[in-house]
């Protein structure tokens, strides 16, 4: 068996075309969806991610504003900037690019962003609503993963899902979203013993640990759906995921590539949340 590739680029392109139409409709009603991004420091990956967000937002006709600061910005100064955007009706989404310098509390920053403009879906209020299955801003990468899974037309209900990784940004929320779809979810992490025992049972395997080629083909059940969230750069400069792709694609029924799988969906779902926030201002 050779797996069908789940094309994140194509799914993202379709979704972005739909969002661009929604932005046009909002503009006719006098609302231009606005996204404010705050970037601190000189982390190359963060700068790359922000460029991607800017390009996507502007391509869809949204208003994008970037505030860039060096690492000397204080926590108090950052919180004050967030307060200004919380009050500014021109902006429907606020995103502070992570990671932050050590002297700034990530928790304080996430909790300072208004839940109504928390397009990353990280605020405790929105996390709580997600837990309850209520309508809210969903975290972008997990939401993108669920959208990709739905594109395969696989019924998620009753499926054995194994999530490898338990970060607040991907692992925990993607498991919760799949639980909300009536899947049976198991989490594995650095303290899990005999991880292969779990992964080999998975109808759907989601791997998000940030370690190159962490999962090999012999840890995957024949015919499983494999979602690889990792983006790792090898010494030769090539990008790879957390799953050993060449072997895994001979075992899986569906698999996401790296790059071109989950990544394009993350920015797309950020745009989705920003448009959703803009729509709320009309109701």
From Swiss-Prot:
KW Zinc-finger (keyword) present: no
Any one Gene Ontology BP term: methionine biosynthetic process
Recorded metabolic or biological pathway in which this protein acts: One-carbon metabolism; tetrahydrofolate interconversion
Oxidoreductase listed as a keyword: yes
HAMAP family assigned: THF_DHG_CYH
Family membership: Belongs to the tetrahydrofolate dehydrogenase/cyclohydrolase family.
Protein name as it appears in the record: Bifunctional protein FolD
Native species: Bacillus subtilis (strain 168)
């Amino acid at each position: 068996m050779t797996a069908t590739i789940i094309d994140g680029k194509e799914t993202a392109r379709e979704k972005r075309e739909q969002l661009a139409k929604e932005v046009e409709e909002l503009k006719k009603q006098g609302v231009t969806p606005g996204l404010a991004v705050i970037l601190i420091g000189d982390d190359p990956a963060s700068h790359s991610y922000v460029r991607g967000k800017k390009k996507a937002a502007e391509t869809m006709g949204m208003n994008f504003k970037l505030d860039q600061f060096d690492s000397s910005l204080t926590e108090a100064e950052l919180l004050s900037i967030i307060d200004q955007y919380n009050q500014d009706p021109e902006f429907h989404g606020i995103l502070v690019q992570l990671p932050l310098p050590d002297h700034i509390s990530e928790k304080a920053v996430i909790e300072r962003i208004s839940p109504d403009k928390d397009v990353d879906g990280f605020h405790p209020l929105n996390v709580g609503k997600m837990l309850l299955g209520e309508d809210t801003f969903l975290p972008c990468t997990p939401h993108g993963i669920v959208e990709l899974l739905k594109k395969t037309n696989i019924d998620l209900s009753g499926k054995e899902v194994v999530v490898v990784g338990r970060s607040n940004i991907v692992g925990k929320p993607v498991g919760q979203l799949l639980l909300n779809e009536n899947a049976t979810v198991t989490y594995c992490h650095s303290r899990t013993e005999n991880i292969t025992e779990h992964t080999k049972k998975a109808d759907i395997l989601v791997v998000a640990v940030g370690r190159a080629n962490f999962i090999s083909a012999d840890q995957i059940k024949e015919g499983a759906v494999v979602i690889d969230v990792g983006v790792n750069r090898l010494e030769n400069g090539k990008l790879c995921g957390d799953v050993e792709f060449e072997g895994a694609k001979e075992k899986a029924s569906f698999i996401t590539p790296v790059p071109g799988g989950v990544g394009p969906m993350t920015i797309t779902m950020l745009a989705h949340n920003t448009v959703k926030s803009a729509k709320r201002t009309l109701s």
